[in-house]
């Protein structure tokens, strides 16, 4: 199945000059969504890990079925003020400003092996912020997986020494 056929391109969103890759047609199609999750799960099956860490909001869409399918725990990472317990945080640069991610301070135990999951790997900024959060908690990131990788933004220059799984590449 050609998963790119289920991605909608939206030019100039969220700002002029950006080509937004919309995953909603893929996730609303049961066959395409299942195929995408199964493809990522098969690759992740090669790694020994305990937990999946993912950012809101679209990261949850990809990570939750993977956690279920692979029988792994899921650690949601959220924007400030969204988690009810004590958190650790990381501030990072975006294309158009700064962002902050929070994770419960007890979400990851020392030496737990973790995989980072998100919908799109663009510049690598969010993935690196997630990696720093995992490491602050004492965890070890063993791999990362995304539905889409925007290779033209060169995220692998930022995410070094970390396996990257992405069935759709632009």
Curated annotation (Swiss-Prot):
One of its GO terms (biological process) is purine ribonucleoside salvage. Keywords: Cytoplasm, Glycosyltransferase, Purine salvage, Transferase. GO terms for cellular component: cytoplasm. GO terms for molecular function: adenine binding; adenine phosphoribosyltransferase activity; AMP binding. It is found in: Cytoplasm. HAMAP family: Aden_phosphoribosyltr. It catalyses: AMP + diphosphate = 5-phospho-alpha-D-ribose 1-diphosphate + adenine. This is Adenine phosphoribosyltransferase. PROSITE patterns: PUR_PYR_PR_TRANSFER. It comes from the Bacteria. Homodimer. Pathway: Purine metabolism; AMP biosynthesis via salvage pathway; AMP from adenine: step 1/1. Catalyzes a salvage reaction resulting in the formation of AMP, that is energically less costly than de novo synthesis. It comes from Fervidobacterium nodosum (strain ATCC 35602 / DSM 5306 / Rt17-B1). InterPro entries: Ade_phspho_trans, PRibTrfase_dom, PRTase-like, UPRTase/APRTase.
